[in-house]
Amino acid sequence: MKKVTDSFVSLGHWPSAGSFGFNTDILATNPINLSVVLGVLIFFGKGVLSDLLDNRKQRILSTIRNSEELRGGAIEKLEKAKARLRKVKAEADEFRTNGYSEIEREKCNLINSTYQNLERLENYKNETIQFEQQRAINQVRQRIFQQALQGALGTLNSCLNNELHLRTISANIGMFGAMKEIT
């Protein structure tokens, strides 16, 4: 047990390295130096810190202003784009409507043109048929007339003899002579 008590005794002889408690010696603790340093830091640091904070504030405000300007520009561009989109949609609807009406108009024109062509072809066909009928009728008439003439000549040639022929010629000469006297 002697060893334990010796160790406590030896603790009492060590020099004091520092202890908890307040040191009331002003020069030993340097509160004047600390207060001067703190005062200088506060006095000069306040301006520097204020300048740093003002610069930071100005950068933040300019960033906000720039952001607002960009936002305003973006909103303006968006409105322009929306207006242009509405305009393009209206033009597309107009083109679509005009396109449909143009298609309908062309369709009607094509139908009318086709009917006119068909009517013209029908008239041409009817004229051709009438012409061919008239030509056939004329050919038939000509043949009938030729056959009638041939038949009449055949009848006359078979019926006429020289004496009848001479009498007919004399009668015709007499008629020409009478006509000559009248004129």
Swiss-Prot record:
* Main subcellular location of this protein, as a coarse class: plastid
An MF annotation (GO) of this entry = proton-transporting ATP synthase activity, rotational mechanism
Keywords for the protein's UniProt record, in alphabetical order: ATP synthesis, CF(0), Chloroplast, Hydrogen ion transport, Ion transport, Membrane, Plastid, Thylakoid, Transmembrane, Transmembrane helix, Transport
Work out whether the entry's keyword set contains Transmembrane: yes
Under InterPro entries, the record lists:
ATP_synth_b/b'su_bac/chlpt
Q: How does it sit in the membrane?
A: Single-pass membrane protein
Return the PANTHER family for the record: ATP SYNTHASE SUBUNIT B, CHLOROPLASTIC
Job of this protein: F(1)F(0) ATP synthase produces ATP from ADP in the presence of a proton or sodium gradient. F-type ATPases consist of two structural domains, F(1) containing the extramembraneous catalytic core and F(0) containing the membrane proton channel, linked together by a central stalk and a peripheral stalk. During catalysis, ATP synthesis in the catalytic domain of F(1) is coupled via a rotary mechanism of the central stalk subunits to proton translocation.
User: Under which name does UniProt file this protein?
Assistant: ATP synthase subunit b, chloroplastic
Specify the taxonomic lineage: Eukaryota, Viridiplantae, Streptophyta, Embryophyta, Tracheophyta
